[in-house]
Amino acid sequence: MTSTQDLTQNRLFDVKGFIAVVTGGGSGIGLMATQGLVAGGARVYIVSRRKEVLDDVAKKYSQKGPGEVFGIKADINDPNDIENLAKELEAREPKGINILINNAGVTQEAEKKGHASSVDYHSADSVRSWLEGNGRDVWQQTLASNLISHHFVTARLIPALDKGSSIVPGHSSSIINISSISGTVKSTSAGQYAYAASKAAFTHLSRQLAHTLYPLRIRVNCIEPGLFPSEMTTGGSDENQKSKIEGAGSKFPAGRTGQEADIASAVLYLGSRAGTFVNGETIHVDGGM
């Protein structure tokens, strides 16, 4: 019989001592996930191509504890970097890892987004020109960054996640894939078709991996965020690797856009004992979009 003590929030959502890896963990939603895990006491390895971001985040957010942040420089689009990432994690965490958050991603359709309001949707030529606007290269690069890279990072880290599933008794390792509400909604996403399609595919890949990996006691779930401040949505970040969105909260019941606590709470739920019986699911953290 479960005791009342086992149902306290400190027990259910505790990640103290957990080992987590967050790709793209140096800014935006990845940093929000990192903050939540560090606040819960986890050891977090953030992965980025930008060493200056890794060093800055590790220094600033480790000081706030109780967990720790470590940076590993890697481009997850590069198979050699994925291999080096895995080997470094194996050397530093021989008992394995508990949580993998696949978050790194790109959108390369800013120009189409900027012209979405000027498209004549009653003109075949206008629509065709808009749809063809960025060409095949943008599609291929977007799919490579937002889908293919995550598949191969996950595959390479399965042995470490397998080991990690036995670290915490009665628990299992957790993969949390950060997709986007753009992969679900029917709107045009302001013309970011490659981005939206890559995220829809990533959400479905998450379900397939959940079915594939359950014999190893590795869970796979997906978070689809809505409008959050990030370098992708605002174009930049401040000295704390944070971004801001002004005046867009009126359409949400919360009266604001997404914040750190919204991502952190979903990550802690899926990564902790609280989410042990949750697998193959998608959580929409979108304010009701």
Which residues does each predicted region cover?
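The beta1-alpha1 cofactor-binding region of Rossmann-like NAD(H)/NADP(H)-dependent oxidoreductases
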Residues: K51-E52, K73-E88
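A glycine/serine/threonine-rich, flexible loop-to-helix segment
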Residues: R11, K59, G114-S117, S189-A190, ...
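Conserved glycine-rich Rossmann-like NAD(P)H-binding loop of the short-chain dehydrogenase/reductase
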Residues: G40-D56
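Conserved glycine-rich cofactor-binding loop
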Residues: I19, G24-G28
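Short, small/polar-rich loop/turn modules that mediate ligand/substrate recognition or access, typified
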Residues: Y214-R219, V278-G280
